[in-house]
């Protein structure tokens, strides 16, 4: 934390923390602040006026980022027979069923997203305590429990990002890399925010989207003027 605070302080003179910046300006500042020796991830944090303790205010879903994430996503698919072959052909990194159960229970977690066909959810369900806390449990509402495994694998590989509101009412999502052109990051962030707007729960009261901010892995957070998105 000390390192992040020091970097944030060092970059403090580049922008006014109290101001909501137009999206393109905020991205330019973030890119200037991203001076680490690796290609930092650009993250969006959206504060929502929802109480996720209530099921009718849960915001959870996915969005396909038009310019991708810049990250190599390792996709694991639980499937058998023909569907397993379709998943492999679509680019899945690991495909299996019962054979993967013991491997994952033994601590192997070298994957980022999980997809499953409905007929093997009995196997996958036994991994709930492992996959659930990591937000990797396949879910029909997210489209990750499906027989159309090839389509879903391709979408994930192309830049689909899953999100889920936290207990604090905040959604975090990686939307690209610091090396991305400003225009590409604008497109990706706009796609995410528009998706969240479409998903406003009917039970949500008051202001739905309270604050939008962006940051890089090691940089400070910058507030974004929502009217610019």
From Swiss-Prot:
Function: Binds directly to 23S rRNA. The L1 stalk is quite mobile in the ribosome, and is involved in E site tRNA release.
Gene Ontology cellular-component annotations: cytosolic large ribosomal subunit
Protein name: Large ribosomal subunit protein uL1
GO molecular function, one term: tRNA binding
GO biological process, one term: translation
Family: Belongs to the universal ribosomal protein uL1 family.
Assembly, per entry: Part of the 50S ribosomal subunit.
PANTHER family: 54S RIBOSOMAL PROTEIN L1, MITOCHONDRIAL, LARGE RIBOSOMAL SUBUNIT PROTEIN UL1M
Cysteine pairs bridged by disulfides in the record: none
SUPFAM superfamilies recorded: Ribosomal protein L1
Cited InterPro entries: Ribosom_uL1_bac-type, Ribosomal_uL1, Ribosomal_uL1-like, Ribosomal_uL1/biogenesis, Ribosomal_uL1_3-a/b-sand, Ribosomal_uL1_CS
Keywords assigned: Repressor, Ribonucleoprotein, Ribosomal protein, RNA-binding, rRNA-binding, Translation regulation, tRNA-binding
Top-level taxon in the UniProt lineage: Bacteria
Gene behind this protein: rplA
